[in-house]
From Swiss-Prot:
Coiled-coil intervals, chain numbering: none
Domain of life: Bacteria
Descriptive protein name: L-sorbose 1-phosphate reductase
Function comment: Reduces L-sorbose 1-phosphate to D-glucitol 6-phosphate.
Organism per entry: Klebsiella pneumoniae
Length: 410
């Protein structure tokens, strides 16, 4: 029997780090260890809502679930049903958005024996049956934990659409060499969107990014400059008026707009900036079920503007993310700003918006406090990070895994 230490959700803002024995692996299941999990704002929302969250079971108070859905690890044992496809020793990542036909269940939200904030998990049959367990052959564990968030961005870009000229047929994806606007776009997901817009398969000719956080804007400006095919502008959100943004587009407006903050004023602003046949993607998931905002329906009718919303990617998006990352076309390491051990994951999850910065990377088998990359106390690890220009790296990860204190199972 396998013992695990895991962060479990019991109710609203009730996260508990506990050690317990996992049930024996069945013939249609897989036993695995988790090495890394990156914290997601969706987990903060989940922890705040508890059983009110649509993916969290009603009986979570008596049947707690393991939180965390952006994880990477190693397969330890494979049940007979899946031995033709998976083997012990393989690294894996999971597409948490299972898209089950009869229920909204997802790893990290709904299951008692699987989630990213754990040392060991039992992967249920549903994950493999939905083709949501993918092998990972990247150089690092931590980049495997960033596949899922990148897949969400890929899904959003794929969901946008425009009309085929002279018809009502939809051409999926952002407009090639069009004008793209990202509002509230310097958080970790926004940075991934910038990277994907610059280095993905379809690139805009103009990319404008706004945010009200000046340090985050400076970070984005430093790490994501213009490319030959894409001119990029970064604007302080306080100064990004409609007139200013419209002028940057040459008066044309924007073909694709992504809203990364659930804010009524931003949505209304975005609506007013859509070009004819433009598409607005509401990426940010609100907690308020009554959330709404005024939009321009005159333009919906006469200018063929479109509105979409996406919540996560699918397995195809995940495979695309894996391919981009393994080919090193998208540099997801740039979004990591903090590291922590499993012991600090609960407090950090509950306080996530206030922490600031980019992605917080949990090494689930280790015990150490939440640490910004610029404040690492270990001089050798700090020197490694400095050598990589402040970016988390394979070298840094290997050092941490070899030298950080192990989490205790007690």
């Amino acid at each position: 029997m396998q013992t695990t230490t895991a962060l479990r959700l019991y109710g609203k803002r009730d996260l508990r780090l506990e050690t317990f024995t996992l049930p024996a692996m069945q013939d249609d299941e897989i036993l695995a260890r988790v090495v890394t999990d990156s914290l997601c704002l969706s987990s903060w929302k989940e922890a705040n809502q508890g059983a009110d969250h649509k993916k969290v079971p009603d009986d979570v108070a008596t049947r707690p679930i393991i939180i965390g859905h952006e994880f990477c690890g190693e397969i330890l044992a494979v049940g007979k049903k899946w031995q033709h496809k998976f083997q012990p020793g393989q690294r894996y990542v999971i597409q948490a958005n299972l898209q089950l036909p009869d229920r909204p269940d997802c790893p990290g939200y709904s299951f008692p024996w699987i989630g990213g904030e754990a040392t060991h998990v039992v992967i249920p049959n549903e994950v493999m049956a939905q083709d949501c367990l993918l092998t990972w052959e990247g150089d690092t564990w931590f980049e495997g934990s960033l596949v899922e968030p990148l897949s969400c961005v890929i899904g959003a870009f794929n969901a946008n659409y425009h009309l085929q000229e002279g018809s009502y047929n939809h051409v999926m994806g952002i407009r090639p060499q069009g004008h793209t606007l990202i509002l509230g776009g310097t958080g970790p997901m926004g940075l991934l969107a910038i990277d994907y817009a610059l280095h993905g398969p379809i690139n805009p000719s103009l990319l404008v990014v706004t945010d009200t956080n000046k340090p985050k804007l400076s970070y984005a400006r430093r790490h994501y400059p213009s490319e030959p095919q894409t001119l990029i502008h970064y604007l302080d959100g306080h100064e990004a008026s409609r007139d200013t943004l419209l002028a940057l587009s040459g008066g044309h407006g924007f073909d694709d707009i992504f809203v990364f903050v659930p804010n009524e004023q931003l949505i209304t602003l975005a609506s007013s900036l859509l070009a004819p046949d433009g598409c607005l993607n509401f990426f940010a998931g609100p907690q308020d079920k009554q959330f709404s905002a005024p939009i321009n329906f005159y333009d919906v009718h006469y200018a063929f503007t479109h509105y979409v919303g996406t919540s996560g990617g699918n397995t195809d998006d995940m495979r695309a993310a894996v391919a981009l990352m393994q080919a090193k076309k998208v540099q997801t390491a740039k979004v990591v700003t903090h590291i922590l051990g499993l012991n600090a994951a609960g407090e950090t999850t509950l306080d996530l918006p206030a922490v600031g910065g980019g992605k917080k990377l949990v090494y689930t088998g280790k015990a150490f406090p939440l640490t910004p990359l610029g404040e690492i106390a270990d001089p050798e690890l700090a020197a490694i990070v400095a050598r990589h220009h402040g970016i988390w790296s394979q070298e840094a990860e290997a050092y941490l895994l070899a030298h950080a204190e192990d989490i205790t199972h007690d």
